[in-house]
Curated annotation (Swiss-Prot), chain A:
Comp. bias intervals (Basic and acidic residues): 1-16
Name listed for the protein in its UniProt record: Transcription initiation factor IIB 7
Zinc finger extent (TFIIB-type): 24-56
PROSITE patterns attached to this UniProt entry: TFIIB, ZF_TFIIB
Annotated GO CC locations: transcription preinitiation complex
Organism for this UniProt entry: Halobacterium salinarum (strain ATCC 700922 / JCM 11081 / NRC-1)
The keyword Metal-binding is assigned to this record: yes
Gene Ontology biological process terms in this record: DNA-templated transcription initiation; transcription preinitiation complex assembly
InterPro entries assigned: Cyclin-like_dom (IPR013763), Cyclin-like_sf (IPR036915), TFIIB (IPR000812), TFIIB_arc (IPR023484), TFIIB_CS (IPR023486), TFIIB_cyclin (IPR013150), Znf_TFIIB (IPR013137)
Repeat positions for Sequence: 142-225, 236-317
Keywords: Metal-binding, Repeat, Transcription, Transcription regulation, Zinc, Zinc-finger
Family classification: Belongs to the TFIIB family.
Curated annotation (Swiss-Prot), chain B:
UniProt feature, compositional bias: Polar residues: 513-523
Subcellular location: Cytoplasm
Domain of life: Archaea
Organism encoding this protein: Halobacterium salinarum (strain ATCC 29341 / DSM 671 / R1)
GO cellular component terms attached to this protein's record: cytoplasm; DNA-directed RNA polymerase complex
InterPro entries per the UniProt record, alphabetical: DNA-dir_RNA_pol_su2, RNA_pol_bsu_protrusion, RNA_pol_Rpb2_2, RNA_pol_Rpb2_2_sf, RNA_pol_Rpb2_3
Keyword check for Nucleotidyltransferase: yes
Protein name (Swiss-Prot/TrEMBL): DNA-directed RNA polymerase subunit Rpo2N
Enzyme class: transferase
Amino acid sequence: MTRSTRQRERETAAKQEEEEDSEEGVRECPECGSDNLVKSSDRAELVCNDCGLVVEEEQIDPGPEWRAFNHQERQEKSRVGAPTTQTMHDKGLTTTIDWKDKDAYGRSISSKKRSQMHRLRKWQERIRTKDAGERNLQFALSEIDRMASALGVPRSVREVASVIYRRALKEDLIRGRSIEGVATSALYAACRKEGIPRSLEEISEVSRVERKEIGRTYRYISQELGLEMKPVDPKKYVPRFCSELELTEEVQSKANEIIETTAEEGLLSGKSPTGYAAAAIYAASLLCNEKKTQREVADVAQVTEVTIRNRYQEQIEAMGIHG
Amino acid sequence: MLQEDKRELSESYFSKERLAEHHFRSYNAFLEHGMQDVVTEKERIETDIGDKEDEEPVWVELGDVRAVTPRVREADGSEELLYPQEARLRNITYSAPVFMEMSIVRGGEEEEERVLDTTETKVGRMPIMVGSDKCNISGFSDEELIEIGEDPADPGGYFIINGSERVLMTSEDLAPNKILAEYDSKYGDEIQVAKTFSQRRGYRALVLVERNREGLLEVSFPSVSGSISFVTLVRALGLESDEEIVHRVSEDPEIVKFMLENLEEADVQTQEEAIEDLGQRVASGQGKNYQLKRANYVIDRYLLPHLHEDGVEEEETRINKAYYLCRMAEACFELALGRREADDKDHYANKRLKVSGDLMKDLFRTALNKLARDVKYQLERANMRNRELTVNTVVRSDVLTERLEHPIATGNWVGGRSGVSQLVDRTDFMGVLSHLRRLRSPLSRSQPHFEARDLHATQWGRICPSETPEGPNCGLVKNFAQAMELSQDVDDERDLKQELSSMGVEGIPGISMETTSTTSADD
């Protein structure tokens, strides 16, 4: 079992590195020009699979030490620190001065040294963010983290949101907009991009800016950054709404079925995906004898009952059911 | 007793419920009122808003806290009930969302107090012990357990963090809030010391009363470097006259003689002088006013904190502290005169066990403080940017979750203890049972500590005399005896005191203030 996890880890690590390499665009065999390079972690080499040339040797293996059975051991035996992350303004590579006034042996230090450390600590804290742009980033990233934490958004999406914000900052899109607004739209965009959409209403509930501003800023940055966002698939909303309404799997699959068949007939175009999903769930709940009122569904999906009624009518007509 | 009855009795001690019962009782008590106690203690989160001119202060009032049953939050945002087996297989944490009532209040200076927002909000996730009251499988029948992939014979009593099962090791500590008299040596002389680990709400302070080689009493306690004269301290606490001090320590003529020596050496005669003297010790080189303020603060904050109680006035607490110090002095003198033996630290009456609930309470307290700091920071920042202050936008639930999960996952507890949580030993079924009923002494295993490792007569019926590892941990890691009964501390001390008072005990602080005025306040 250990063997397999290790392999998995190595594989993912190798994959990541390959991705990084491809970004740099230098990874092809200097001898035969093939891009079929293989990383052999057993020998710490990068080998060309076609001609056999060793492109790189003595690579550093960032993985943990041999034999680590659980999380704790893996951490202890790891030869490197935490991976860099985009969610921190310095990518998590800061030096921090510990607040404990102890030397390397754990002994207390003299009062003179202590006040010196105090000063160093203060200045370290001050110069960590070197300019306004950096401060801006620090503030925005902590906002993203705060909102993501309130929404229960996973780590990977926070990473994406941070990258979007960083790009916006680099292209000078923040000017004239509030930091919070751009941060919120970056998070909204990241959620959509990663296929776990949150509606603007949900996002604005935890954000410190208004819905209107988020929408406006989002449109602007997605256009400027060329995010090419496709309309959200209403099916993405189904599991969440269903679990909030405490509906069974059966209703979920029925709702998905309704969405699929009706969307094929072009009913979805131009309609709000949340409303569409809500109507399908409402219809499915009726069909499966687990009726929820329009009010209940509307509350969860944060749409109006009118929207649900309209979409519902269209959907059952298209399905050929008469409710 | 009949043979059959005996058999039934002994069998019931081996029933499933009994094996990890101490864990369940302790953890359930924590969920039921321990968590609420911590929140009530905290009461409110103050902010620095309002320090500036024309700005009204803002703070957060904390209300009821509750945990639901374990749930998992999927990436798409849906939330579903989680069963232990799923948590193990998916490498996720078996934890339940915790909700707390919070209200942001502004005003109080010029404007009227105004509640800006009040909501019950999710503040984080609490790891739930498998088999506890809040566990999703509690009350399930064997068939139902098998249905969801659970082992009906599994005793529970552990947590599941990131898919790994972790037990919190019961730890054996010296009893707090108890006077322990013992011999010590200082500069080659034998001296007598009375010790008390005074503990209240997670704050622990060691108070020492020493009788040095001149026969003078000295007291040391946190935040005062070195030691101060016993007489000075009791005078600062309001026990002024010579007669009263002597009377409070002991009536024994020989001890009175010792006390008189001490009084002769005293530098101060009145309470004011004593507090001034103390002020010079705790804040030397500062202004006079600050010295006094600091001295009073130190007395009320760091000296014998366990004597504080809600609803008891500071004045009364101080005099109780003086009486308590007199008891400690008496213990010192009695030891010096050979009237009593040194207290046995290995005696089980002088030990208290910290079970999972107590450990979780410590953890929750620091986690809540961390959350409070974060809320304060978020509030100040939102206020600075003139945003509307709402509860939902200032609480980062990750803060609390992280602080609760990380120590259980790594075993690095608050207060620098490590190895508190351990991976459940699944070598075989017996291994699990033994592991859940194991307890650990905090003494270092690299030092001999021969007495602590020895089997003590008072362990009879409580600790298994033979189950202990070989090697460096021998005698420091122990296991419960099968028929061990673990009693819990009193939840409501007031009830206990009322009861004692009705039985004729006089001078209990906060209970019988009106009935006793001149009579002795000794216990």
